[in-house]
């Protein structure tokens, strides 16, 4: 690696995992000027693309996922740590699949399944928006399914 001070080559003095365990911290020394510097090495993750219902494609946005879950959990006794973990788990699962393109339907279904485990009311709220319930009968059917599964 080139020295940021003089452009000369450097050697690695020390390597260790960074505090987040997702990077490697390397202490380096320039062979030309002798100055020391630190670099961080991370795996470059290819972008995850969401394919919308109308065929449009957009980059995965964790904040959109989190906003939807937060809205469903509004005024419910669901700790923020649980919501964050839910979003982390869904994102990790999506990124671990071999597909770089994920239909929005898959994301919605995973959110509903996760919310079903966390809080029934949050699940029904999310489902009513996600599945675009048109009347009370659709709402009732979803509630009945939830009650049967418990």
UniProtKB/Swiss-Prot annotation:
Which PANTHER family does the protein's record reference?
A: TRANSCRIPTIONAL REPRESSOR NRDR (PTHR30455:SF2)
Q: State the UniProt keywords alphabetically.
A: ATP-binding, DNA-binding, Metal-binding, Nucleotide-binding, Repressor, Transcription, Transcription regulation, Zinc, Zinc-finger
ZnF unnamed span: 3-33
Q: Which HAMAP family match?
A: NrdR
Protein name, please?
Answer: Transcriptional repressor NrdR
Pfam family name, one: Zn_ribbon_NrdR
Entry function? Negatively regulates transcription of bacterial ribonucleotide reductase nrd genes and operons by binding to NrdR-boxes.
Gene giving rise to this polypeptide? nrdR
Q: What does the Swiss-Prot or TrEMBL cofactor note state?
A: Binds 1 zinc ion.
Task: State the family named in the UniProt similarity comment for this chain.
Answer: Belongs to the NrdR family.
Species assigned in the record = Symbiobacterium thermophilum (strain DSM 24528 / JCM 14929 / IAM 14863 / T)
Q: Which cofactor does it need?
A: Zn(2+)
Q: Which GO terms describe its biological process?
A: negative regulation of DNA-templated transcription
State the Gene Ontology terms under molecular function: ATP binding; DNA binding; zinc ion binding
Domain ATP-cone positions = 48-138
């Amino acid at each position: 690696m080139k020295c940021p001070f003089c452009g000369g080559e450097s050697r690695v003095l020390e390597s260790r995992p960074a505090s987040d365990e997702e990077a490697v911290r390397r202490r380096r020394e320039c062979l030309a000027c002798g100055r020391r510097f630190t670099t961080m090495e991370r795996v470059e993750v290819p972008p995850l693309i969401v394919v919308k219902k109308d065929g449009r494609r957009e980059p995965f946005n964790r904040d959109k996922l989190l906003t939807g879950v937060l809205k469903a959990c509004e005024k419910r006794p669901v700790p923020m740590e649980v919501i964050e973990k839910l979003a982390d788990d869904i994102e990790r699962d999506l990124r671990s699949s071999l597909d770089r393109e994920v239909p929005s339907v898959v994301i919605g279904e995973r959110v509903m399944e996760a919310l079903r485990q966390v809080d029934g009311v949050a699940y029904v709220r999310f489902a009513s928006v996600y599945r675009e319930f048109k009347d009370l009968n659709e709402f009732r059917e979803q509630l009945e399914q939830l009650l049967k599964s418990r």
